[in-house]
Amino acid sequence: MDSTTLSQTPGSRVSQYIALTKPRVTQLAVFCAVIGMFLSTPGMVPWTPLIGGTVGIWLLAGAAFAINCLVEQKIDAKMRRTSWRPSARGEITTAQILLFSAVLGGLGMWTLYTFANPLTMWLTLATFVGYAVIYTLLLKPATPQNIVIGGASGAMPPALGWAAVTGHVPGDAWILVLIIFVWTPPHFWALALYRRKDYENAGLPMLPNTHGEKYTRLHILLYTVILFAVTMMPFISGMSGVVYLAAAVLLGALFLAYAWKIYREYSDDLARKTFRYSIVYLSLLFAALLIDHYARVLIGA
């Protein structure tokens, strides 16, 4: 520990701990969980599970990301994209990260058990284990299919939100999980393409490094086609109506256009734009689910 670390202000220390929770990723996950809460009921979500579920899921997600930062601190230090993280820079010790994660995780479990229900607590804990242990420790350093297999834990937020309100997870909730599960590979492979040297330097077996750029571009296109089909399921199942359908078709068509361009004429700039659009895509798609849900409630559909 050097003099710079010792002289840090409380504000900078707080920001370092917040950075461990990967706030932007956490926000998207919690957003999808909250959408799951609202889709689970035709009326307003009761305040207790809404607030308790949101806070509990947020805390456990932050705990999982903190463990991820701890495990990957040496890897992160080798990558331009992640070398700024306080864990990679050695600004927070291993013991501090473990304690921080344990506190967040413990508070999250207590919050979910107390203000939501035991099922949500156990499902969220399983998601924590899936991401922090199975994906981070076992899959990511071992196989280029890490994103495909490990994406199951990252796809769980809508089911967690649904369970927080109703105490069970019906088929409609699993459709939402499936959407995120299929969305995950093209989202991350676009990132892996334009950051492939980063991943190569870190020794991670991401698809562009193990199977080549062309193979990855093809699979981004294939998964985006599958995603387009999967996003029709809420309408086909009757969970959503024409408002959602129109949004899904428009958003999906644009995603397909990006994937097709990547397949035909690749550039790092295009991959970067595709990655960024994929985040906007998922956010707007789930927002469309919510708008459609309450539009149908208002008209009595």
UniProtKB/Swiss-Prot annotation:
EC number(s) given by UniProt: 2.5.1.141
Pfam family, one: UbiA
Keywords: Cell inner membrane, Cell membrane, Heme biosynthesis, Membrane, Transferase, Transmembrane, Transmembrane helix
PROSITE patterns: UBIA (PS00943)
Pathway: Porphyrin-containing compound metabolism; heme O biosynthesis; heme O from protoheme: step 1/1
Membrane topology annotation: Multi-pass membrane protein
Entry-linked Gene3D superfamilies: UbiA prenyltransferase
Domain of life: Bacteria
Membrane-spanning segments: 25-45, 47-67, 97-117, 119-139, 147-167, 173-193, 235-255, 279-299
GO annotation, biological process: heme O biosynthetic process
Catalysed conversion reaction: heme b + (2E,6E)-farnesyl diphosphate + H2O = Fe(II)-heme o + diphosphate
This protein's GO CC annotations: plasma membrane
Record's keyword annotation contains DNA damage: no
Tagged with keyword Cell inner membrane: yes
Miscellaneous notes: Carbon 2 of the heme B porphyrin ring is defined according to the Fischer nomenclature.
Protein purpose: Converts heme B (protoheme IX) to heme O by substitution of the vinyl group on carbon 2 of heme B porphyrin ring with a hydroxyethyl farnesyl side group.
Family according to the record: Belongs to the UbiA prenyltransferase family. Protoheme IX farnesyltransferase subfamily.
Protein name: Protoheme IX farnesyltransferase
Origin species: Paraburkholderia xenovorans (strain LB400)
Annotated gene: ctaB
